[in-house]
Amino acid sequence: MKTYITLTIYLLYIVLLFNCKNEKQETVVYNKPNILFILSDDHTSQAWGIYGGILKDHVKNKNIKRLANEGVVLNNAFCTNSICSPSRASILTGQYSHINQVYTLREPLPDSHPNIAKTLGDNGYQTAVIGKWHLVKQPEGFQYFNVLPGQGRYWDPILKSKDNWKDGHDGSVGKVHKGFSTDVITDLTIQHLKQRDVSKPFFMMCNFKATHEPFEYPDRFKDLYNDIDIPEPQSLLDFGKGTGGRTFVGQKLENLEARWEEAYRRPNEFWTSYPGLPFEKEGLDSIGLRQKIYQKFVKDFMRCGATIDDNIGKLLDYLDEAGITDNTIVVYTADQGYFLGEHGFFDKRLIYEESLRMPFVIRYPKELKGGQRIDDIILNIDFAALLADYAGIEKPNYMQGESFRENLKGKPPKGWRKNMYYQYWLHEPKRPAHFGVRNDKYKLAYFYGKGLNKYGASKEDTPPTWEFYDLQKDPKELKNVINDTVHQSIIDTMKEEIKKLQSQYNVPSDVPHFE
């Protein structure tokens, strides 16, 4: 009898233990996948650690590697206009900037403009966006939103919701959330997911401010990299226009140091603050100064990026705890690339590889085999079409991009693009407006140098110039070979490809043409 009672108690204990373990897990009652779309700002591929490069052994990337090992990595994902607001608009709409009307940094999406959140919401999804929005007007298509005003701030961020919305980048309205921005946005995302209707699939955008300038970080990472020197890019000591045939000055690292100086001297007047000031530079020549700027800049950038990796881990752990990992598509990407000292630059905007390239990883256990890499050319205008496809929705007519669902399984559709078209509109003399085309071997760019009356663009035109790079022989784009006769037939072919793509994507007629 004692044996029977003991066995009964033991079995009851096992049942209770199992139930306690699973009390937070959800029962999936819908047949469409959840979508968690994690979007960071400027977190460039050089700083992910899964794309190789000089920083791969230094970045903190445990959870990014986890996603890559469990999902599919895109080796050739590119943005179509490398700057924050336009790229975000293209991700949402599946359209080039000249179609969705977000060319620069202050334009909103037009009222009632279609986007993937609206499309998913109309097809049974709960839609939400938390974090950076940067599209001026109130988000449309998102049933719930809680977003930063403009760029927002890293510490104790203000977020705006339907209850306190005001158009623009005004941070005087909204609610203050104590803590570091990346941590706060993650916690709010998880909180919202816990409170949602579990009988419906969700589309959640978790948008980090990091790693945007000024590259701040929480105290837990302040000593990271203190005792080491970070390797330098090959072109760090490129000091200006004419180097390797480059036709413009660019955003030099010394301009970042000038911002540090101004922020330190006028903290109440400058537009932001930076960690780790003052920056001492006495006694340094131009080479020593640039090297020292680079070390501070890239260390701050990677410390800021470390918080993203931490919080990706928190999001993945939540999905596991809720029991919805298998039925949830997780995407992590950045809105564009970023220069980390290459060509002596910081910032983005250009058709050069570091700026053009978007890091991208996707996990969907039900369909995608982990640890795979895809070399096909994928654009940010394709992301919306992919999500619609996974949701069982025929691609809407408003989208210019294409679903790459089959590409992710190693089966690219017949006729998949071999060339991609890029156009940057926010003209200024040191970084002229330009368009171009890239394929797996070459890149051709036309710096037409006109603002075309776009918001914030300079009215000072620059002479039109061409740049051409052989990406197989010169992957770092150190030598513009536009005038090499050996390449002329290829250049002529690519010029025709530009015209073809401009026609295909309905590029406006006021964009400068060439013969």
Regions found by a protein language model. Give the residues of each.
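Bacterial N-terminal signal peptides
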Residues: 8-16
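Formylglycine-dependent sulfatase
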Residues: 2-4, 8, 20-466, 475-496, ...
